[in-house]
Amino acid sequence: MYTNYSLTSSDAMPRTYLVGTASPEMSKKKRQSANCDKPTRRVIHIIDTNEHSEVDLKNELPITCTNEDGEMTSSSWTSQTANDFLKLAYVNAKLDPSLPSQYFKQDIINVLQSLEIPGWSVPGSKESSLNKNLLTLTQIKGALTNVIYKIHYPNLPPLLMRIFGDSIDSVIDREYELKVIARLSFYDLGPKLEGFFENGRFEKYIEGSRTSTQADFIDRDTSIKIAKKLKELHCTVPLTHKEITDQPSCWTTFDQWIKLIDSHKEWVSNNVNISENLRCSSWNFFLKSFKNYKRWLYNDSAFTSKLLREDDKDSMINSGLKMVFCHNDLQHGNLLFKSKGKDDISVGDLTIIDFEYAGPNPVVFDLSNHLNEWMQDYNDVQSFKSHIDKYPKEEDILVFAQSYINHMNENHVKIASQEVRILYNLIIEWRPCTQLFWCLWALLQSGRLPQRPLIEGEKLMSEKAGLGDETHLMEHKNKENGKYDCSEDDSFNYLGFCKEKMSVFWGDLITLGVIDKDCPDIGKTDYLDTKLIF
């Protein structure tokens, strides 16, 4: 029975968050006043001031970007930036999508009223004027662990509601995510946040858009625009000094995920598990191969290692090895198009969404990862498969690389073919890295590893899926027992996805000369038809 379950307004009093870093005193206040009548404030800055000294903030970290008139401008972190913040409302309440629909809707209305979201609440009142019978919830398909809804009410702008998963497979560093959202908001990027609750948030819903498809990605004109859009992202959001000097976030995540998998000793010691899913003889062989690949990339590769060894730092910065703020997951569901004809779409009509994996990486990681997505068709019956025949041909990659380099070129000088060739080769050398990233993600998401509490410092990011057009939506309905299982529509074959990625990973390591083609420890391999250009 769910009688009297729904939240009352007094249970959900709002707090206001200022996105940045909280002092211990502020954190203590927050805990003491979670259910008080007056909102408390938490100061979280656009950039984490704990990561900077005054010297760091005075050092210019210039980034080139364009203004609304298309003119070149520069920006950098300054002491003034460190004092900027994003003001967010927060309410101490949880929403449970497993409740019967009418109770769930009433809880949503109560939280919306407490957050005082304009239009969705009555100013100065504890009671909402909204009728739960007129509220429509439409669940967005494709989110693999988080539950995402479009909320519609007559004559009100629709909202997007995310309810975070609470299992080990949906653990995300929400504190870092808040800082990322704050930074994106400072540059008018990312989700337009309306308010937070304990296990989720409300965002502005992007009307009149559709998610991109595999066909969009492989279209030459569209691919050029995507390259330019990525360049704009990379040139808009500066990194902190710490982010520039630390190792790329991809390697940090690898360390965390491998440590997590390795902690399941019974699973990793079973060579049948390893052979079936990682396409090799043993866990030890996998670990050795991963270390050998990383060592090869930084010490012996033809282009990455050469650029890192050069004294001319400009050569490295102008290549794909420059550390930038990356999206790290630009797949079909995370790129929205304004609903126009394909020929009418401009770079400004593209919107990148879902920054849960965003962070500092070399340019080449973002580019190589995106081009891998040409092989995926998440709308296909076999959505886990990697269609290797769809991977971009040499000319496609060269055009993509040239479009990226030439866009927002400060000197308006056409880039030499040598720089395009270098970026092309970096994309190939880093391709195993981006393949393996999502292979391990899929293994952790599969549920085949026994669940256990995370070791301190570990984090497992999730939700490799997007949102957008109405074809990815379904009505929220109750099961016969009055409960709604938000996972019942999740039929993605994680282990199949893992195996497909591993086959390409091993094929790449053979082609690049990291391991021998006749190595008896490797199982099924797939080979992509691109080679380095010398």
From Swiss-Prot:
It comes from the Eukaryota. SUPFAM superfamilies: Protein kinase-like (PK-like). The modification Phosphoserine is found at S23. Induction: Induced by zinc-depletion via the transcription factor ZAP1. Expression is sensitive to intracellular zinc levels. Repressed by inositol. It catalyses: ethanolamine + ATP = phosphoethanolamine + ADP + H(+); choline + ATP = phosphocholine + ADP + H(+). Its main location: cytoplasm. CDD domains: ETNK_euk. Catalyzes the committed step of phosphatidylethanolamine synthesis via the CDP-ethanolamine branch of the Kennedy pathway. Also exhibits choline kinase activity, thus contributing to phosphatidylcholine synthesis via the CDP-choline pathway, but its preferred substrate is ethanolamine. This is Ethanolamine kinase. It comes from Saccharomyces cerevisiae (strain ATCC 204508 / S288c) (Baker's yeast).
